[in-house]
Amino acid sequence: MGLTAAEGERIAALLDTQADKLTASWTDAVAAPLRGRLTRAELQRQVQDLHRAIVEALRAGAFDLTDERSADLRATLVELSRGRARQGFTASETAVTVFGLKQALFDVVDVRGGDAQVLADLLAVGQVIDDLGLFTFETYAKAREGLIADQAEQLLELATPVVKLWEGVVAIPLVGTLDSARAQVVMERLLETLVETGSPYAIIDITGVPAVDTQVAQHILKTVVAARLMGAECIISGIRPQIAQTIVALGIEFGDIATKATLADALRHALRLIEATRKARSN
Amino acid sequence: MTTDVGLGEPQLVTIAADEDVVRVRQLVRTVAVAAKLSLVDQTKLVTAASELARNTLVYGGGGGAEVTVVDSGRRKGIRIVFADDGPGIADLDLALTDGYTTGGGLGLGLSGARRLVDEFDIDTAAGRGTRITVTKWAR
Amino acid sequence: MDRVPVLKIGDLLLVSIQVDMQDQTALALQEDLAERIVATGCHGVIIDITALDIVDSFVGRMLSSIASISRVLDAETVVVGMRPAVAITLVELGLSLDGIRTALNVERGIELLAQAREPETPDDLGIDLDLDRFGPATS
Ligand SMILES: Nc1ncnc2c1ncn2[C@@H]1O[C@H](COP(=O)(O)OP(=O)(O)O)[C@@H](O)[C@H]1O
Ligand SMILES: [Mg+2]
């Protein structure tokens, strides 16, 4: 943390001598901007954990946050910022938990009457706290990114419901813009549902899709081929005139894939095929 | 940091017999799971590895596969290097053509493996052996 | 080397591929199956690949060969239980498994085989029509 051994030792002592008063003042500084969204007891516990971790790291001779001996301190900070990110606090509401220590130090340490040594140490500790704050901020940002990615994925899955329409027939009504990533999720979900439900027919309804590009058309095509490899047939319904034109203009071969105007037509087609199979068997 | 299986340190499998191809598949699967590749991406990578390991054995006369977890800073990935001191490939474009085989196969190993990974690099020449490097990134 | 067991169930042969197969095991299965078809007189073969977490071009070729050999021996083959990730990968690999019948599970596979045998029964409509073409004498 950019400190000399002597500084580290002195600062650890400074933080430790009036520990209770310091953490109380620190908790106050943190509690104000959070406006009761966390209980005081909870904040106090977090602040005490952090205080203990900082003192221990300094005592262990860790003068840098990347130091091996700072592992515990890092873990405490990571846990704190992840928790805040998950609970929906902002970045500054998270960082204030660390910066509150500065405020508390000025409350507890006698700055006016203090000698030059104490002032110098306070400056040095200010640097340390800035480092810790930055680290917290970075961890917070990473955690947020992860959360957002997870949510995006969940939304993606919510937006692609696969429904069992009939015994042996599942349907996936696609609504909205299909990009390549979503098309891929759709493909996997559909194929998984075929296995789960043992349905040999799948209807891909694209009535609600305004446009397709080459990639998306390819994804749909690959889904159909993959389904065939697994022993299931896909029927595509609701192809808009513009999309039909795009498909032809792009030179994409839909070959012998069954296409129907509406979802109802597609279901009727599937039921007819199921009926034909049943007749063939009972003959 | 126990999840970083093999991060930085390559794991080596010698390819000298049929069962080594199976071992390559198993190692690649383990590493792909640890690097958190999606199930489909795991399957694609293991399939590509199976194709290339078999080529190393059958056409390269044996060699090795080196599996490494790599980190681009933004995401993790798996890099596999297949190397042999066999006859090499004289006409690479031809070998990479779907359906081309000199061994009665389907001729989809090289071309298919290339489609299954994110990065595909091949270093070969007649009489100089073959070295193929593939990378698949976690999404 | 492991051998894949071939079970006779009713008038069908059932093969459940359970192991991560070596190439030699796959070739042995091909031979075993041909012998069992002749020995049992079965007309249907179900190959269950539910347990396979990858199918590469070698296994793909084996499945095609089995289907072709069985057909020569008057038996139909159905491959059942292919996992979604495997199917997606095969599409990318470029393997079409032409000429292989597939079904989602063993039950559907049995149905498909029953259907496949139908047209060969003598009272089938198709045969009547064919015979009609040769003139009224046969009708
Ligand atoms: N490691 C290698 N060394 C030499 N030749 C190779 C190697 N890998 C592939 N080849 C050549 O490239 C051809 C195509 O390989 P591949 O696409 O895997 O098809 P297949 O294995 O079915 O022959 C092989 O038939 C062989 O001639
Ligand atoms: Mg090959």
List the predicted regions and their residue ranges.
Chain C
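Short acidic-hydrophobic, aromatic-tinged amphipathic segments that line or gate anion-handling sites
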Residues: 99-109
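A short acidic, often aromatic-flanked loop/helix-cap motif at beta-alpha or helix-coil junctions
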Residues: 14, 108-111
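Catalytic cores of nucleotide-enabled group-transfer and carboxylate-activating enzymes in metabolic
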Residues: 37-40, 66, 111-116
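Amphipathic alpha-helical interaction surfaces in cytosolic regulatory modules
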Residues: 40-43, 47-96
